[in-house]
Structure formats: structure tokens, C-alpha cells
Amino acid sequence: MGDEYMDDDEDYGFEYEDDSGSEPDVDMENQYYTAKGLRSDGKLDEAIKSFEKVLELEGEKGEWGFKALKQMIKITFGQNRLEKMLEYYRQLLTYIKSAVTKNYSEKSINAILDYISTSRQMDLLQHFYETTLDALKDAKNERLWFKTNTKLGKLFFDLHEFTKLEKIVKQLKVSCKNEQGEEDQRKGTQLLEIYALEIQMYTEQKNNKALKWVYELATQAIHTKSAIPHPLILGTIRECGGKMHLRDGRFLDAHTDFFEAFKNYDESGSPRRTTCLKYLVLANMLIKSDINPFDSQEAKPFKNEPEIVAMTQMVQAYQDNDIQAFEQIMAAHQDSIMADPFIREHTEELMNNIRTQVLLRLIRPYTNVRISYLSQKLKVSQKEVIHLLVDAILDDGLEAKINEESGMIEMPKNKKKMMVTSLVVPNAGDQGTTKSDSKPGTSSEPSTTTSVTSSILQGPPATSSCHQELSMDGLRVWAERIDSIQSNIGTRIKF
């Protein structure tokens, strides 16, 4: 709303008697515009004195005095004369009962509260909100009372004063109940504002049990006919819902909520849209999706923003399972990525996902692998390697046994899936021998499957001790036998 109601000079719904020709009104109007001219010229102290003369000319409280006080509040706020500003504000609040219309006073006071909300002096803001609420006890302006209380509640949230916030929420909920003591569904929009406050509080407290309950209520309220929520409120609810889902491991639901939050923030022009887009990318990585989130029409315009570029680089490194590149990107973008507590909360999970994929790739060709070798390759402690292996066994179905005494990872010899640990060399004089893979940190033992393979591959007995030379026909025979093995053990072998 900004200066629209802080600096206006038009008639906003006033009903005047036919007194346009009265001399006092003309004098006050002229004095008001003289003061505005001084303010425009930067002569602020002179402007304040000139605005005060408007109040002196005013016999009965009316529009010109109300407008003059708004201007003086604005000037003294800019000068950081906060005590004087509060004095003018208290004086202005005496006008809201009868001097100006209810609608105009409501919009003007909302504009003033929005205007001073840029101050980082939380005690000043609290004083302003509480002063407004005191003045509204007799004014009977429910909408202004509700809006002021929600602003005060947001302030308590920013200050992490959750006990005070809970008290505000209770008062707001009472105002939304009908005569039977039930929530008045006609006040769906107000209920959503209350839920948004609660949801933010429970998200910050990581109280998922309470958060789920309020989130469900908010989701129901969104679909009521009486609810016409501001996109900013919807964005807040969806963002917190996404955080809740992500912490619960429901990555797909989180992805959906973050995308909805991003769209709502974008519609309202909120800077939170960029933050939520980063959360969307985070969820996209955790669901291990190959779909680029920036392919959507809504997200595409933000693709080249510096903070988002860093996230897209992270996605590429993540999909490539490139641990070194991933860590370098996080280190290079501490301010835009790691400064966010929520993203930081989940980066270790992303790193573990990458390490797990690299781990599986490292052990795939072998039946036995040393834990120390994996530790060296992954650049983590042996304890962390064991932790990753346990997760891979439980979550990814890895068929392996951890032998901590020998420091080895052992693959079961009776597993159905064939592990290509050695290459069988058909030899007439030395049937069934194997040529072991001798990569560092690994060892190879013929499993049951390998033994079966050796016996099938040994071929017809040789007539001499020399190695057989295979003709093209002989190779075809071997190929047919290999196909037979593959159909029996359910895997493909590449020679």
C-alpha cells in the first residue's frame, strides 16, 4: 500500500455537508499545501511547523488535521525522531472514531503500519501495534483490529517469542468463531491468515505433529468458498508444507508444495519466490528426478539468476555423482546456498546419496572389497563407509556382508545375481582356471555362480597340453553356451 494512503489528497468516501465555502476549510487547505510544498523542497523542520498550524486552525477534528498528522508521522520517521513520531501517531488515532470514515482510517493506519514496518527496531514496532490495539478497543473496527494483531503476531514470530505469538493466535481464533463457539466458515480468509502464522511457528519449532494438524486445517480452508486468500498467505502455507514433507521424507509431496509456493510468491511479487525455487531444486534432487525443474514455464525466467545458477550447478554435479564438484560448488556459494539453514539441513543427505552411488559403483565388480580402500576413494572415515553400506543394504537392496574384523565387504557366494569378478579362460590343459581382477583394495573369489560358469565353459577335452586355438565355428559354439548361461542366471556378461 506504501504511500498511497500516506500521501493522498483526494476524497476517499467522505460525506461532507455543504460547507465548501467556509473560510476555515479554505485556510486549512491552503496551509496544508503550503506545508507539503516545504516538505517537497526538503525543508522538513519548517514543513512540520507548517503542518502543526493546520491543527491550530482546526476547530473540530476533520480530514485536514488527519492528513497533516500523517505527513508529520512520515517526516519524523525519516528523521528517526521516534518519540515525536509516536506522539503524532497517538494524536492521529483520536481521529478514527468519528473524524474520518471507517474505511479511510483503516486503510491509512494500515499504510502507516506497513510504512514503519521497514524499521528493524522491534520494540518500536511492538509499541506501535499495541498502541493501535488500545485505540481500537472503543473504535469497534474488527478488520483493523484483526490486521493489527496479525502484524503483531508476525513480529513475535520474527522475535521467536512463541509464547506471546500463541496468545495472539488464540485471540484471533476467538474472533473467528460463531455464536455456537465453532469456527465461522464465512471467515475463511481470516482463518487462513491465522493458520499461516501457526504453520510458520510450528515449522520453526520443528513440531511436526502440531504442524500436520494445522496444515490439514489450512488445506481444507483453502477450498472453502468463503476463503479468498492472498497469494502471499498461500505461498507461506505451501512453503511450510513443503518443509514438513521434506523432513518426513515425502520428497514428492514436498516437490509439489514447493512448486505451488513458488507460483504463489511469484504472483504476489514476494522475494521468497527465489528461496522457494531453491527448495524446489533441493526436492528435485532428493526424489532423484531427471526432469529439469527449469523446464516449466513459471521457473524458466529465473534460470540465470546468480543464486539459481549455483543450484543448477549443484544439480549437475549431483546427477553426475561427482562428489568433488558438489563440494566445490557448496564452498564457492556459501552465501547463496549454505547460508540458508533449511538447505544446510539437507545437504548432508544429498552428499550421502552421492557417496552411496559412488560406493555401489566401486564395489559392483567384486566379491570382496576392503573398507579402507572405499574410505580412501570416498574421502570419508571407515566408520562413515560402514554407515553408508548399512544404508545401502537396508534401502538399496545391496547384497553384502560387513566383516569388521577383517575390514572387508563380502558378497554372498550363493547370490543369484552374478558378480563379474573374474574372467574365465577356456583352457584344454587347465580347465576352469580363472584370471583374477587385481585392482587395489579388492580380491576375487569364485562364487557358486562362477564355479558353475567355469564348469560349463570348460569345453570339450583337449587332445594335447597346448592351449586350444578357436576357429570362427568354435567361437560360435562358445557364444551359444554363454547365451545358455545368461538365461539360467538372469544376467548379461560382456566379453
From Swiss-Prot:
Which compartments does it reside in?
Cytoplasm; Nucleus
Q: List the record's Gene Ontology CC terms alphabetically.
A: COP9 signalosome; cytoplasm; nucleus
Query: Which segments show compositional bias classed as Low complexity?
Result: 442-455
Report keywords, A-Z. Cytoplasm, Developmental protein, Differentiation, Nucleus, Oogenesis, Signalosome
Matching InterPro entries: 26S_Proteasome/COP9_Components, PCI_dom, TPR-like_helical_dom_sf, WH_DNA-bd_sf
Q: Where is the PCI domain?
A: 254-416
- Give positions of region: Disordered: 1-26, 426-468
Gene Ontology BP term (one): regulation of oogenesis
Which Pfam families does this one have?
PCI
Where do Polar residues bias regions lie?
A: 430-441
Major location category of this protein: cytoplasm
Establish whether keyword Acetylation is in the entry: no
Q: Does the keyword Nucleus apply?
A: yes
Q: Which domain of life is it from?
A: Eukaryota
Q: How does it assemble?
A: Component of the CSN complex, probably composed of csn-1, csn-2, csn-3, csn-4, csn-5, csn-6 and csn-7. Within the complex it probably interacts directly with csn-1, csn-3 and csn-4.
User: What the protein does?
Assistant: Essential component of the COP9 signalosome complex (CSN), a complex involved in various cellular and developmental processes. The CSN complex is an essential regulator of the ubiquitin (Ubl) conjugation pathway by mediating the deneddylation of the cullin subunits of the SCF-type E3 ligase complexes, leading to decrease the Ubl ligase activity of SCF. The CSN complex plays an essential role in embryogenesis and oogenesis and is required to regulate microtubule stability in the early embryo.
What family does the database annotate? Belongs to the CSN2 family.
Name listed for the protein in its UniProt record? COP9 signalosome complex subunit 2
What's the source species for this entry? Caenorhabditis elegans
Query: Which taxonomic lineage is given here?
Result: Eukaryota, Metazoa, Ecdysozoa, Nematoda, Chromadorea
Gene symbol here is csn-2
